[in-house]
Structures are given as C-alpha cells and as structure tokens.
C-alpha cells in the first residue's frame, strides 16, 4: 500500500466527473487500499478517487463504524434534511454548514463485484453525499450555506 497525494482546491481534476469502473482488478483494489491508508493518515472520514488524481468512481469512508469501499456508488433514495458542518481533505482549514439528506440509500459494487446497498443516516449520509459529489466534480464549498469560523469548529473532522 502507498500514501497518495491529495489534490487541493484549484487542481482541475477535482472539477471533473469520474468515469465508472468497468473491471474490478488488482489495480482497482490497490487504489482502494491506498485511498483508505491515505484517508486514515490524514484523519479524514472519506476520500474519493479524484481527490488522489484518479478519475474513477471509487470512494472510501469510515465514520467510526468500519471501512466502506464503494465502487460506482449511486444514491438511489434520499429522505429528510439535515444541516451540519463539513470540511474536506482537498480544502484544508475551510469548514462550512451544508444541507444534506438525513438518510440516503446508496447502491454500489464491493471489491468482489457484488451489487450492494447501504442505508446511511446522519454522519454516514453526509459522508456518502459528500464523496459522491466529488465523483461529479462538485465540492462542498459549492453547497455551503455558511462558512464557519475557528470558534465554531470544535470537533469537526474533514471528510
């Protein structure tokens, strides 16, 4: 496994739409493993492949309930509304309140190619939406309702 360089805001790759994964092979598995290692090293809760310069629909997330690896994730259902703080490993030091669904259902492939669905609520719903937005070339700052100052940031981790 290897630590990947996290692309920062201003890098054009962050604004490009990622392409679907058509074959799950050892290269894709290595990318997922590298992404997870990179996310953990940087104390994040999620990372999309384009954040490490790879335009493929790959996401890793860990909101404290174990690592999720999602290949070709898509939101198939959303419900409710929540407004909460977000940050991003690609936009260090910037945080803001973003409106997201309270609950989402996401369909994806696992590393064996099996179709799976996961229902996420609260922080997991927020992380899923944030990372899937990345795959569309959308950053959380595009959706910020209000930027947060240092006094309001206690306990906020970068997604």
Swiss-Prot record:
Q: What is this protein called?
A: Peptide deformylase
- Paste the cofactor note: Binds 1 Fe(2+) ion.
Record: residues binding Fe cation: 88, 130, 134
Instruction: Describe the function of this protein.
Output: Removes the formyl group from the N-terminal Met of newly synthesized proteins. Requires at least a dipeptide for an efficient rate of reaction. N-terminal L-methionine is a prerequisite for activity but the enzyme has broad specificity at other positions.
Assigned protein family: Belongs to the polypeptide deformylase family.
Q: What GO MF terms are annotated?
A: metal ion binding; peptide deformylase activity
What EC class does the entry list? hydrolase
* One GO-annotated biological process of the protein: translation
- NCBIfam families reported in the protein's UniProt record: pept_deformyl (TIGR00079), PRK00150.1-3 (NF001159)
Q: Where is the active site?
A: 131
SUPFAM superfamilies registered for this protein in UniProt: Peptide deformylase
Secretion signal, residue range per the UniProt entry: none
Q: Which UniProt keywords apply?
A: Hydrolase, Iron, Metal-binding, Protein biosynthesis
The gene for this chain is def
Q: Which organism is it from?
A: Caldanaerobacter subterraneus subsp. tengcongensis (strain DSM 15242 / JCM 11007 / NBRC 100824 / MB4)
Q: What is its EC number?
A: 3.5.1.88
Taxonomically, what lineage is the organism? Answer: Bacteria, Bacillati, Bacillota, Clostridia, Thermoanaerobacterales
| Pfam families to which the protein is assigned, alphabetical | Pep_deformylase
> What's the catalysed reaction?
N-terminal N-formyl-L-methionyl-[peptide] + H2O = N-terminal L-methionyl-[peptide] + formate
Cofactor(s), names only, from the UniProt record: Fe(2+)
